[in-house]
Amino acid sequence: MYLSAQLMRTVTASHLTLRALSTPPLFQHRQIAAVEWCGTTRPGLARQKRTQHASSVISKSGVLSAKPSSVFLALLAGKLAEKYIYARMLLFHVSVVNECPVVFHSGPVVWK
């Protein structure tokens, strides 16, 4: 299942925020089961993963916030090529778990 929802990326010094731009926002329906952040410190190195359960990062307003490690903050700050980082959302839909990768671009984040 592919979703057409778009996300907007906002990076601050302490956290990453992904806000749903779809109507209604997917986050408000608590469809996300977990979020896996994945990236490398340098091209060619093994990927480092961090998984967080959605119940601990999704707010009532539909905003997903996470506090990644400094490795991910460096990646998100644009110090490395964006192709070396991605986030994977695990969604529940009609009792079926669907995997939808998210690719970061310089503009809005788009479900692939």
Swiss-Prot record:
This is Putative uncharacterized protein YLR415C, mitochondrial. Residues 1-21 form a transit peptide. Keywords: Mitochondrion, Transit peptide. The keyword Transit peptide applies. GO terms for cellular component: mitochondrion. It is found in: Mitochondrion.
